[in-house]
Structures are given as structure tokens and as C-alpha cells.
Amino acid sequence: MHKRTFSIAAGGMVLAAALGMAGISTAHAQSKQIVYLTPGLDLPFWRYLSKGVESVAKEKGYGFQALDSRNSAQTQLQNAQDAIAKGVAGIVLSPTDSSTAPAVLALAAEKKIPVVIADIGTNSGDYVSFIISDNFEGAKGVGEALAAALKEKGWAKDSVGLITISQARKNGQARTNGFRDGLKAGGATGSEAGLQQMQTYTADETFKYTQDMLTANPGMRGLFVQTDQPAIGALRAIKAARRQGQVPVAAFDGIPDFVDLLKSGEIVASGMQQPYLMGQRSAQAMFMHLEGGKPEKQITVPILVVTSKNIDKVLPTVKTTVFANEVK
């Protein structure tokens, strides 16, 4: 009787242990996932960065998911809550803007989920590492290239317009300030035709902003658009106004369409961040932390200032680190 009772009890203990181990295994399996919270996958830049994170996560045997915030801080917060509820191993965060990032960081910190920030930056909060491009120097190089193009045409004293990303973002502020310094350093001394901040980050939005700027400033001779896809809208507006060749356009980041546009001179320069490389660096910092290491608090990835004059030389690098091997 006692022997049987002991056997049953022992069997129960073995079963409980087995169930416990299964529970641990399941929880561990659930946690072997990296989530990337992105502002909006409609912009190629974020898609390329996402691919970089995914490539390293898969190398490490982890699952990966990108959650699109559709440029909404509220949606990004909800995405963060969903990821945290699933008990993910770590979050790579590109905030919708720097002022809303602390709310996401606070949620993750409460559940002890590590966060690596990729690109935009935060006003406050705890994080493992911040992977950033040197937006100021990149934009300064773009400003210098546009100034050179204006000087060649004899337009160095004419006005230049800016269509920017959100100036609530630290990277947006750096691009604006760097570009202004670059224009000045390059000898462009004209006034600023105006500054419009993007809201939807679409080519259609930039088309309208450019139309309005050209109408209000008929003497405008240059334009800086602070991200890639929207720059196509600016070119369309210049063409619609029959001002082709009269308003040189400089841009930031890069999409495959830029290759031919740079070669033709329709875009004179673009400060190309390397989003695929940034995504890889973000994931590498995360795994260093998960494996007990201590990554650098800030990791800077250089920006490639690509111009009509150097595009052929730098194109092999651009295809990999900028376009995530989507271009052959």
C-alpha cells in the first residue's frame, strides 16, 4: 500500500517535473523572438532596416516580427504592449518621434525586456544601445553638394527650400542644422524659401508642398527633401511647373529609383543612411546584451553622401547596405 502510494506520488512528481520542464521550454520558445517596432513600412528605409534586424535574428536561431506603427505614436504604443504581452526576448525600436519613445521604453522596462533604439532617438528612458547615423555630417555633405551645384549655375545667392521630416525627431533637427551649415560652408548665401514638415511622408504630400513653395517663391533655385520616396513628389511638382533643370533637388536616404536620377542629375546629391547595416548593428547589439555582454551605448553608422559624380563608384556598397540587396 505504502509502496503503491509512493509509486503514484513519484509518478506524479515525475509528471509534474515533466510538465514544468515543458512549461519552461514553451516559455523559452515563446521568448526566442525579436520584434522590430517601426514607424511605417511604407517607407523603404524602414523596410531595409527591418531586413537587417531579421537577418541577424535568423542567424541566431530567433524568430522575428516587424510591427508597423503607420506613423502613429498610439499605434506604436499598442504594438509595444502586444509584443511585451507575448514575452519577446527583445525589442528594436525606431520611434515615431523622440518625444513618444519614453512611453514605450517605460513599458518594456517594467517587464525587463531589453530595447535597442535604431535611428530616431529618444528624449529620455532606459535602453541597451542607440544605433544612429551621423545625420548632421551627412546633411552637411548634402548641403555642400547642393551649394556646389548652385554655384556652377550662378545661383549661389538664390533661395533654397526645405521639406523636412518631423522636427520633433532628433534626427530631423540634425538634418536641418547640418544642411544649413553645409550650404553656408559651400558658399550658398541665399535666403531660405521656407520649411515644411512632412506629416504623411508620401510623394503626394511633398508634391503639394513643392507646388506651394514654388508658387510662393518663384525665384527658388534649390530644394532639400529629407527622405527618399517623398523626393519623387518634389521632382513631379518641378516638372509640372515646367521648372526642370531650374531647381536642383537634394535628398536624404535612398531608393533604387535614385540611381538613375543621380546619374541624370535630376537629384544632385543624397545623404544615404545605410539602413540594412543599421538593422544588423541593432540586432548585434541586442544579442550581445542577451548573451551577457555590454554593447556600446551609442553606435554610429556612417552616411554615404552620394552625388551625380560618385554614384558609379559607390554603387556596389549602396546595393548592399542601403538597398538590402533588393537591387541587382
List each language-model region with its residue ranges.
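Generic N-terminal leader/processing signal
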Residues: 1-2, 30
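C-terminal segment of classical bacterial N-terminal signal peptides
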Residues: 16-27
